[in-house]
């Protein structure tokens, strides 16, 4: 029997505690940062960087990612609403992050970090952050998959996914799910690409000494 499509019914939430949902997206996001920090710490130690540099870089990155991703979502995808309800920008627990906003925030943070902490070329810090970032990106895309979001165009391929179009109403109120037509699971495609990039960057850094040439990674 041939499969014509995969019906995706994953619940965005894992469980609730004290009235707050713990979602797959948030879990993947948090795990990505923790694993990313472990990789970054190993890289900084390998480079004999002064003690404290990695911790400071991590703090800069965390703050910049959250602020940048949140503002990116509000400005690029919900300006009409958030311009009328500016205090709702602070309600980050309700969801709404944009990866490109986070990227802009991180680049600004690394510029400040390089000026105030390392006093080195900004590319030195960017190279070292790029490696774990590829892995974090893969995990975040899996979070998007669990949220039934950013899927691709319709497809007749057997691995097309039928996502729940009204996922918020279905999840919150138990409404009958409305499925999309079979679509490309671009979240999975992108996650696999990020993993390939992560493997390549790890190889370049550890085997080809790419970290010695700022900007190469």
Give the positions of each predicted feature.
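Hydrophobic, membrane-interfacing alpha helices
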Residues: 1-217
């Amino acid at each position: 029997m041939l499969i014509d499509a995969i019906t995706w019914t994953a619940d965005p939430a894992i469980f609730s505690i004290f009235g707050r949902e713990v979602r797959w997206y948030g879990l993947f996001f948090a795990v990505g940062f923790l694993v990313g920090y472990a990789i970054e710490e190993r890289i900084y130690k390998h480079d004999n960087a002064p003690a404290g540099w990695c911790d400071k870089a991590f703090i800069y990155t965390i703050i910049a990612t959250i602020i940048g991703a949140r503002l990116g979502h509000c400005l690029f995808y919900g300006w009409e609403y958030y311009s009328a309800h500016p205090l709702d920008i602070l309600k980050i627990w309700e969801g709404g992050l944009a990866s490109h906003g986070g990227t802009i925030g991180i680049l600004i943070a690394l510029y400040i970090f390089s000026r105030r902490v390392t006093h080195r070329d900004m590319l030195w810090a960017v190279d070292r952050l790029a490696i774990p970032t590829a892995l974090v990106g893969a995990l975040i895309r899996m979070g998007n998959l669990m949220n039934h979001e950013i899927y691709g165009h319709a497809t007749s391929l057997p691995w097309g996914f039928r996502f729940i179009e009204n996922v918020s109403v279905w999840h919150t109120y138990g409404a009958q799910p409305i499925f999309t037509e079979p679509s490309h699971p671009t979240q999975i495609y992108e996650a696999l690409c990020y993993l390939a990039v992560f493997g390549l960057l790890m190889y370049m850094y550890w085997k080809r000494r790419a970290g010695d040439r700022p900007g190469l990674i």
